[in-house]
Design a protein with these regions (language model features):
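Crotonase-fold acyl-CoA enzyme core
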Residues: 101-204
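Short hydrophobic/charged patches on amphipathic alpha-helices used for structural packing
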Residues: 6, 41-42, 97-100, 123
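Phosphate-coordinating loops and pocket residues in cytosolic domains that bind phosphorylated ligands
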Residues: 28-31, 64, 73, 173, ...
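Hydrophobic/aromatic residues within transmembrane alpha-helices
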Residues: 18, 55, 67, 125-127, ...
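Conserved CoA-thioester-binding segment of acyl-CoA-metabolizing enzymes
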Residues: 1-58
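Charged catalytic carboxylate motif
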Residues: 32-36, 95, 102, 202
């Protein structure tokens, strides 16, 4: 079984449990995590022992979004010419899109088990999954608007296939939080469980 720096993987009874494993950083998505998600899901897609994949997060939150240190590293890159720096950013975004598309392309059903906060890049991630479930107290937010960014890694392309377009636009324009009960009402999640333990037991 593969081992990863930012993920934990366990396969039992034909269920692959992939857990985001940066709890001290609220599972913020650093560069290694993006690459490992692609490697992991491409492998699980071809694994004959795996019939379903459950994606969850360790610690208090599912995912706090993209690790902003990634962008600091890009901004501080040695490229000084604006055009070259812009092209480098474009190539980085294309790679990140490919990383998450591996979840969407996985040949096995992927179920997201969400607790705590699911923000920004976390929304990109769960919108790639086939089904989403959450615990009471979970919150969802397309936060990119608050830092002057576009949700350009898949949220705006995938969410309109999951929830109504008008709701997608409202959430993208305002960055407001969606609580668990509203997430169920708008169809973002299939069901809400009492707590994280009940969530994982129910989804498994």
């Amino acid at each position: 079984m593969q081992t990863f720096e930012t993920l934990s993987l366990n396969i039992e009874n034909h269920i692959a449990h992939v857990e985001l494993n940066r709890p001290d950083k609220a599972n913020a998505m650093n560069l290694p995590m993006w690459g490992e998600l692609q490697t992991c899901f491409e492998s699980l897609s071809d694994d004959p022992e795996v019939r379903v994949v459950v994606l969850s997060g360790a610690g208090k939150h599912f995912c706090s979004g993209i690790d902003l240190d990634m962008f600091a590293a890009i901004a501080n890159d040695s490229q000084s010419e604006p055009a070259r720096k812009a092209e480098q950013l474009r190539q980085t975004i294309l790679r990140l899109q490919d990383n998450l598309s591996a979840i969407e392309k996985c040949r096995k059903p992927v179920l997201a088990a969400i607790h705590g906060s699911c923000v920004g890049g976390g929304i990109d991630m769960v919108s790639c999954c086939d089904m989403r479930y959450c615990a009471q107290g979970s919150t969802f937010s397309i936060k990119e608007i608050d830092i002057g960014m576009t949700a350009d890694v898949g949220t705006l392309q995938r969410l309109p296939h999951i929830i109504p377009q008008g709701v997608v636009r409202e959430l993208a324009y305002t960055g407001r939080n969606v609580e668990a009960s509203e997430a169920r009402d708008i169809g973002l999640v299939n069901a809400v469980y009492e707590n994280r333990e009940a969530l994982l037991e129910g989804v498994m």
